[in-house]
C-alpha cells in the first residue's frame, strides 16, 4: 500500500475536467476512530464505481481515493511525520505482523499517536510469523504463504502438474510480491502459530485448463510445536484489503482480526460449513505423489508430518500428540497446574505463570479515576473501560461489542462451535 501512496495529487486540477472540482475537500469532523471506520466503509461502497462507463471510471476512482486518504490523514491538521507514522502503522497491520490489532491500536492511542513512544512500548510478543499453508491439488503439493492469492496457488500447482508429464519442463518456484512466497513442503522457515493442522477442501470458481474446476486439499502447517492458547478470533473487517487465500474478488487472507488461533481460514461460519471435511482420528494428511524424481525428496520431507491427531470431542486437529493431550485437559477440566498461594488450577504452566504475577506486591499501574492498582498495563486499560463504557471488541458476524478480549474470544468460540455443528450435520464432500 505504501508504494501506491507515492502517487502525487498536488498538481492543479484541469479546468476542462468536469469532475476535478470534486477534489476539494473540507476537513471532516468527529472523533478520529469514527472517521477511520466511516472511511473504510466509504471505500467498500465506492468499489461499485468500477462498473461505470469507460470514459469516467478511472478518473472517478482516483478522485474517490484522493477524498478517502484526505479524509483519513487530514493533512490540514497533521504534520508530515504524523501522516507517515499513521501510514507506517497501517501498513504494519496490513502485512499481518500484529497478532492483535485491537491491542495494537490501544497502544497507539495510549502513546498519543507518537511513533517513537509507540515503539518504546512495543514488544516482540505482538508479532506473529507469517503462516504457511500446505496445499494438495490433483496429486501436486507445496507450501504457500497464507497471504498468497488462491488464483496464484492454482496457477503454480497447474504448472507443477504439467511438469509431471513426459513433455513437461523443470518445475518453477512461483514468486509473489509483497509477501513473496511459495515454499516447497518441508522448507518453510517461519512455521505457523496454529496448534494443529486444519484440513478442508475448496472447490474454487477459478477454472484451470480444459475448463475443469481443480479440487484443493488445504492443510494449515506448522514447523514447531507450541502450547495451545486459549484465544480465538476472527478477521478484523478493516484488513479486508489484504490479499490472501480466500474467495475470489476480495481475496481475503489470514484471519485477521486479532490472532487466528484454532480458527479455520476466512469466510466465517457460512464458509466453514461448506469447506470442512471431518474424518476419524488419527488423520493421514499427506497424499502420496506420483511422477518423476523431482518429487522424491519432496515426499521425504513430508514423511515426518504424515499423521495428525484429531480430538474425539470436537473437530480440532493437532499435529503433535502432546498438543492433543494438552487440549483434552480442557474437555476433561483437568487443571493440573495449581497456584501455591490460592490453590487455583490451570490447564497450562504458562497460564499459571501469568496468574502468579497477580500475587506480586508490585502494582505500578494505577487507575486515575478510582486509584485501583494493577500489575499489568493491559489490565489497567481493560479496567478503565469500565469507567469510560468503551467496548472496542466487536464481533464481525453479529456486531455485538465487548469490553474485554477474553469475553470477546469466548463469544467467537460459540460461533465456531455453531459452525462445526452445521458441518457435522451435512454430508461429507466428495
Swiss-Prot record:
InterPro entries: SCAN_dom (IPR003309), SCAN_sf (IPR038269), Znf_C2H2_sf (IPR036236), Znf_C2H2_type (IPR013087). Disulfide bonds: none annotated. GO terms for cellular component: chromatin; chromosome, telomeric region; PcG protein complex; transcription regulator complex. Keywords: Chromosome, DNA-binding, Metal-binding, Nucleus, Repeat, Telomere, Transcription, Transcription regulation, Zinc, Zinc-finger. It is found in: Nucleus; Chromosome, Telomere. One of its GO terms (molecular function) is RNA polymerase II cis-regulatory region sequence-specific DNA binding. Residues 44-126 form the SCAN box domain. It comes from the Eukaryota. GO terms for biological process: telomere maintenance via telomere lengthening. Residues 1-38, 164-196, 224-257, 281-300 are annotated as: Disordered. The keyword DNA-binding applies. Residues 164-185 have a biased composition (Polar residues). A zinc finger (C2H2-type) spans 309-331, 337-359, 365-387, 393-415. The keyword DNA-binding applies. Embryonic stem (ES) cell-specific transcription factor required to regulate ES cell pluripotency. Binds telomeres and plays a key role in genomic stability in ES cells by regulating telomere elongation. Acts as an activator of spontaneous telomere sister chromatid exchange (T-SCE) and telomere elongation in undifferentiated ES cells. This is Zinc finger and SCAN domain-containing protein 4. It comes from Ailuropoda melanoleuca (Giant panda).
Amino acid at each position: 500500500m505504501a508504494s501506491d501512496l507515492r502517487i502525487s495529487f498536488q498538481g492543479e486540477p484541469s479546468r476542462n475536467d468536469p469532475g476535478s472540482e470534486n477534489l476539494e475537500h473540507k476537513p471532516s469532523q468527529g472523533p478520529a476512530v469514527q472517521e477511520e471506520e466511516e472511511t473504510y466503509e466509504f471505500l467498500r461502497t465506492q468499489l461499485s464505481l468500477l462498473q461505470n462507463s469507460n470514459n469516467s471510471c478511472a478518473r472517478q476512482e482516483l478522485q474517490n481515493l484522493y477524498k478517502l486518504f484526505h479524509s483519513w490523514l487530514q493533512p490540514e491538521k497533521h504534520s508530515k511525520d504524523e501522516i507517515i507514522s499513521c501510514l507506517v502503522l497501517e501498513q504494519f497491520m496490513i502485512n499481518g505482523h500484529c497478532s492483535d490489532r485491537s491491542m495494537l491500536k490501544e497502544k497507539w492511542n495510549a502513546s498519543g499517536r507518537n511513533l517513537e513512544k509507540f515503539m518504546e512500548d512495543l514488544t516482540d510478543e505482538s508479532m506473529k510469523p507469517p503462516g504457511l499453508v500446505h496445499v494438495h491439488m490433483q496429486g501436486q503439493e507445496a507450501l504457500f504463504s497464507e497471504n498468497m492469492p488462491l488464483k496464484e496457488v492454482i496457477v503454480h500447482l497447474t504448472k507443477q502438474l504439467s511438469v509431471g508429464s513426459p513433455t513437461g519442463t523443470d518445475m518453477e518456484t512461483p514468486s509473489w510480491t509483497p509477501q513473496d512466497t511459495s515454499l516447497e513442503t518441508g522448507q518453510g522457515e517461519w512455521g505457523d502459530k496454529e496448534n494443529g493442522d486444519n484440513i478442508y477442501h475448496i472447490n474454487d470458481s477459478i477454472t484451470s485448463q480444459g475448463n475443469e474446476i481443480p479440487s484443493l486439499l488445504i492443510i494449515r502447517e506448522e514447523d514447531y510445536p507450541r502450547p495451545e492458547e486459549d484465544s480465538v478470533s476472527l478477521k478484523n473487517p478493516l484488513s479486508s484489503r489484504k490479499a490472501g487465500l480466500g474467495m475470489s474478488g476480495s481475496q481475503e487472507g489470514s484471519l485477521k482480526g486479532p490472532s487466528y488461533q484454532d480458527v479455520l481460514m476466512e469466510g466465517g461460519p457460512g464458509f466453514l460449513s461448506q469447506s470442512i471435511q471431518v474424518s476419524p482420528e488419527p488423520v493421514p494428511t499427506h497424499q502420496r505423489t506420483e511422477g518423476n524424481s523431482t518429487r522424491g525428496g519432496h515426499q521425504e520431507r513430508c514423511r515426518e508430518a504424515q499423521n495428525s491427531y484429531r480430538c474425539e470431542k470436537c473437530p480440532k486437529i493437532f499435529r503433535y500428540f502432546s498438543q492433543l493431550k494438552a487440549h483434552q485437559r480442557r474437555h476433561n477440566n483437568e487443571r493440573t497446574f495449581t497456584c501455591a498461594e490460592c490453590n487455583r488450577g490451570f490447564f497450562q504452566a504458562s497460564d499459571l505463570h501469568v496468574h502468579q504475577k497477580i500475587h506480586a506486591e508490585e502494582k505500578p499501574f494505577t487507575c486515575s479515576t478510582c486509584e485501583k492498582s494493577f500489575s499489568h498495563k493491559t489490565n489497567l486499560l481493560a479496567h478503565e473501560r469500565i469507567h469510560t463504557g468503551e467496548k472496542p471488541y466487536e464481533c464481525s458476524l453479529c456486531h455485538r461489542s465487548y469490553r474485554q478480549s477474553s469475553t470477546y474470544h469466548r463469544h467467537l468460540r460459540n460461533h465456531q462451535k455453531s459452525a462445526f455443528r452445521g458441518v457435522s450435520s451435512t454430508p461429507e464432500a466428495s
